[in-house]
Amino acid sequence: MSDGVKHINSAQEFANLLNTTQYVVADFYADWCGPCKAIAPMYAQFAKTFSIPNFLAFAKINVDSVQQVAQHYRVSAMPTFLFFKNGKQVAVNGSVMIQGADVNSLRAAAEKMGRLAKEKAAAAGSS
């Protein structure tokens, strides 16, 4: 996508992203969720700013159309942001998830993931 966000349409598509990208930020949202709509432009901006192919991706997962993934990660409130490293859920800045449209926490997490991914990409000889 031109905004840098990868829209996930199936559990297999999400599994593939986790297997091919070192760091992933996942936004679990619903079309009917007001706070999800409110934070979406900021999430897209973070994706545009920090995404690095194969090193950091920003995914959006609709909890109504990809229920299997939402249930697997026990997402019960929207939006919920989860963080992954090498396919496994990890904590960023002390939290394994951010629930709600908390722009400051999301910005801090995106910046940290961006720094980590940039370091890995540089070490791998990618820019």
UniProtKB/Swiss-Prot annotation:
The active site is at C33 (nucleophile), C36 (nucleophile). The record marks G34, P35 as: Contributes to redox potential value. Residues 2-115 form the Thioredoxin domain. Pfam families: Thioredoxin. Keywords: Disulfide bond, Electron transport, Redox-active center, Transport. Disulfide bonds join C33-C36. The record marks D27 as: Deprotonates C-terminal active site Cys. CDD domains: TRX_family. PANTHER family: THIOREDOXIN-LIKE PROTEIN 1. Belongs to the thioredoxin family. Participates in various redox reactions through the reversible oxidation of its active center dithiol to a disulfide and catalyzes dithiol-disulfide exchange reactions. This is Thioredoxin. The lineage of its organism: Eukaryota, Fungi, Dikarya, Ascomycota, Pezizomycotina.
